[in-house]
Design a protein with these regions (language model features):
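Glycine-rich phosphate-binding loop and adjoining beta1-alpha1-beta2 segment
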Residues: 48, 53-91
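Conserved N-terminal Rossmann-fold NAD(P)-binding element of oxidoreductases
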Residues: 29-31, 54
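N-terminal charged helix/coil linker that caps or initiates catalytic domains
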Residues: 1-27
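Hydrophobic/small residue at the entry helix of a nucleotide-binding pocket
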Residues: 35
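Conserved SAM-binding strand-loop segment of SAM-dependent methyltransferases
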Residues: 73, 95-101
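Glycine-rich phosphate/adenylate-binding loop
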Residues: 2, 113-119, 124-129, 139, ...
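Conserved SAM/SAH-binding loop
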Residues: 100-108
Length: 218
């Protein structure tokens, strides 16, 4: 193991064979907000050889309290491009595909067929593209993990990793379950969710944001 190997600690933990698998993997991360940006960075630091990141949003002042790409110097800039520069600075050898696009039902199949993905991280916060991504990934037998809702919640001790069908106290999980059932999806889906009940005082009803009926404290 070379002294200048920046992945030395990870290799000590996981072993050489697992590191080879990680370096040979192509991971798709969709949604680069409060969850996806951090997940993508950890994958980058873990040594994933190839990654595709997808998000059409630009950095807004309301992102400053929690989102990785949000700084005064990056306001108004595309999140995907800001993060791509950061990830390449961390791991110059990573093969990075940057897609600053908004996923819709009709362009998800094209995305999933554009490359051979080994794993998908779903960090989308709107129902339709989230469910359609899950549906299309399962059709193609691509492994996927999905992030559920954390808005209006603050107790990190209640974060859980479970099957979608076993979640509770999570409005997004409930909505995703209903939509997937209508789409005929009955397979297990690993998700990250919180058992904490949302604080109603931290929810602001609004119709101003695209595909969102409320804004939650985060």
């Amino acid at each position: 193991m070379e002294e200048n190997n920046w992945q030395q600690r990870t290799e000590l933990l996981l072993g050489e064979e697992k590191m080879k698998r990680i370096r040979a993997s192509h991971v798709l991360v969709v949604g680069l907000g409060g969850v996806g940006a951090y997940a993508a960075e950890m994958l980058c630091r873990a040594g994933v050889g190839r990654m595709t990141i997808v998000d059409a949003d630009t950095v807004q002042p309301t992102n400053m309290n929690r989102q990785l790409p949000a700084m005064h110097s990056t306001l108004g800039m595309p999140k995907a491009e800001v993060l791509a520069a950061r990830y390449k600075d961390i791991n110059p050898d990573i093969e990075l595909t940057v897609l600053p696009v908004y996923l819709k039902d009709e362009n998800i199949p094209e995305l999933l067929d554009s490359a051979k993905f080994d794993f998908i991280v779903d960090a989308i916060d709107t129902i339709s593209p989230k469910c359609f991504l899950i549906y299309e990934a399962m059709k193609r037998h691509i492994k996927i993990v999905s992030s559920m809702g954390a808005g209006a919640k603050s107790d990190i001790a209640q974060i859980r990793f479970a099957d979608l069908w076993d979640t509770y106290h999570c409005g997004l999980s409930k909505a995703v379950r209903k939509r997937l059932q209508k789409m005929g999806v009955k397979r297990k889906l690993p998700v990250v969710f919180s058992t904490e009940q949302a604080d109603p005082k931290a929810v602001l009803l609004t119709d101003d944001e695209r595909n969102k009926k409320s804004t939650c404290g985060t």
